[in-house]
């Protein structure tokens, strides 16, 4: 390469770092495609690495993400009319909030993204800010709004690849799994690499295609280009092993993830779950406490509370449930919808009717995921309405992944309704899938299975689920969105 060309490349690199999101593609090329004549380029700074990761669809390291936030905060103070810098800053705030489980970042993200659109509207091509708003809505569990923003980008710029991860998450949250699959198809036509593999693994796992999901996650580990990418893919393998009822294998994947990136805090929680299943309870307490200290998510507090509950440590359990309520309240103040985890808590440890009211309202807002169906069905059961509960439990088990928790919930509902054969089949399924699925509920599942006994002569018909009273499976769950009038599970799934 001659001197003039070398200097031109250096000038482009400097311009790219100054320009922000509009130069993300350039940064990606400069960082990941070294010039063969000149040798490898100088090591990129943290801001450039974070931008390059964003271009690749990859997670930036926490340190690089923090550096990017500081860089863009400085940029917009000095250049308040830079719509692209505002869009990058807003998206970086969203990612920071997710990585730290700190919802206080989300109002700041919304302000930055809307400022970007004020400077340059979507009609004038500012689709980057719309993608950021979609990611923000997903982070707040506002999936209908995320769908709106993602579809706007898809309509304006159908080849803008980063709209499709937003749409996949939104459709999953709404329970529109065919649409999520179509969004993944579009993404794979536009992009390749580790993050597309990771997205594929997630979609396949949601559909219950575990072998396909594991194959994609394994390939993502092999092709990872950063420790953070590798840790995320290893964590996915850990989750798949956990769901299969293999805590020892899951623990190995979580440990490998933490070895790759010690700040991959979700793997700390996964590690705690696996340790508890292996009987290493004291270690599990410590791992959960470390995870919650670094990533204070209410679902982790619920898991630790239930682990304490199972051990008879009522005071410690109450402390965790209080922490959960505090975490949910803080999230809600910052626009995050945490009704699902709060409903799960209320069903088993608080007021089941309050859980019914909360989750029925969520269903009325179009949140028809299998997780929501399972939670609403269980809340109805715990509130004494097994007949209305069964259609929701059926949706969760029939349309979702092979989940031990979902199968147990359905089995208990069927047992209450006198549907002995189906109850036996689903509780058996729960214990075969993952005998350690919950420190609190797995022992109850074993007790229920023992109480059900063995099938009588002619057992195959009994075990098929066709015998017994099946009329409850067609119960009318109503037509509206108000509490007590949720739409039937099959109506808009």
Task: Give residue ranges: language-model regions.
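N-terminal leader/linker segments that initiate helical-solenoid repeat arrays
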Residues: 1-121, 125, 435, 439-486, ...
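Generic helix N-cap/helix-start motif at coil->alpha-helix transitions
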Residues: 124-130, 156-164, 191-199, 226-234, ...
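Residue-level recognition of tetratricopeptide repeat
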Residues: 91, 95-98, 135, 169, ...
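Solenoid-like repeat scaffolds
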Residues: 77, 118-121, 152-157, 185-191, ...
């Amino acid at each position: 390469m001659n001197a003039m060309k070398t200097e031109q490349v250096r000038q482009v690199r400097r311009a790219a770092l100054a320009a922000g999101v509009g130069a993300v593609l350039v940064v990606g090329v400069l960082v990941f495609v070294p010039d063969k004549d000149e040798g490898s380029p100088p090591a990129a700074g943290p801001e450039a690495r974070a931008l390059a990761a964003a271009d690749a669809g990859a997670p930036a390291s926490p340190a690089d993400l923090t550096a990017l936030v500081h860089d863009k905060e400085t940029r917009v103070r000095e250049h308040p009319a830079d719509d692209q810098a505002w869009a990058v800053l807003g998206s970086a705030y969203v990612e920071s909030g997710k990585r730290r489980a700190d919802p206080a970042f989300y109002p700041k993200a919304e302000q930055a993204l809307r400022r970007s659109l004020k400077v340059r509207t979507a009609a004038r091509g500012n689709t980057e800010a719309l993608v950021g708003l979609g990611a923000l809505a997903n982070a707040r569990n506002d999936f209908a709004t995320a769908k709106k923003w993602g579809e706007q980008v898809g309509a304006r710029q159908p080849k803008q690849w980063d709209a499709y991860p937003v749409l996949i998450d939104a459709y999953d949250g709404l329970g529109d799994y065919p649409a999520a699959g179509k969004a993944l198809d579009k993404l794979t036509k536009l992009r390749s690499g580790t993050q597309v593999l990771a997205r594929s693994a997630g979609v396949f796992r949601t559909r219950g295609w575990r072998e396909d999901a594991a194959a994609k996650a394994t390939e993502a580990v092999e092709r990872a280009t950063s420790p953070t990418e590798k840790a995320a893919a290893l964590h996915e393998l850990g989750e798949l092993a956990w769901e299969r009822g293999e805590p020892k294998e899951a623990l190995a994947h979580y440990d490998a993830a933490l070895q790759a990136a010690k700040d991959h805090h979700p793997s700390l929680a996964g590690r705690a779950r696996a340790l508890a299943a292996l009987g290493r309870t004291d270690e599990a307490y410590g791992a959960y406490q470390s995870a919650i200290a670094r990533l204070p998510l209410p679902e982790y507090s619920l898991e630790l509370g239930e682990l304490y509950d199972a051990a008879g440590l009522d005071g410690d359990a109450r402390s965790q449930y209080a922490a959960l309520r505090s975490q949910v309240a803080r999230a809600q103040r910052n626009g995050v919808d945490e009704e699902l985890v709060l409903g799960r808590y209320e069903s088993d440890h608080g007021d089941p009717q309050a859980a019914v009211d909360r989750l029925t309202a969520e269903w009325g807002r179009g949140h028809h995921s299998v997780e929501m169906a399972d939670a609403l069905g269980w809340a109805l059961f715990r509130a004494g309405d097994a007949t209305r509960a069964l259609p929701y439990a059926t949706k969760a088990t029939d349309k979702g992944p092979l989940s031990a928790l979902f199968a147990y919930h359905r089995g208990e509902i069927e047992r209450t309704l006198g549907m002995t054969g189906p109850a036996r089949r689903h509780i058996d399924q729960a214990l075969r899938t993952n005998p350690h699925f919950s420190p609190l509920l797995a022992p109850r599942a074993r007790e229920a299975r023992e109480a059900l006994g063995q099938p009588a002569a002619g057992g195959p018909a009994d075990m098929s689920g066709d015998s017994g009273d099946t009329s409850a499976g067609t119960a009318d769950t109503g037509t509206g969105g108000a509490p007590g009038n949720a739409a039937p599970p099959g109506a808009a799934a």
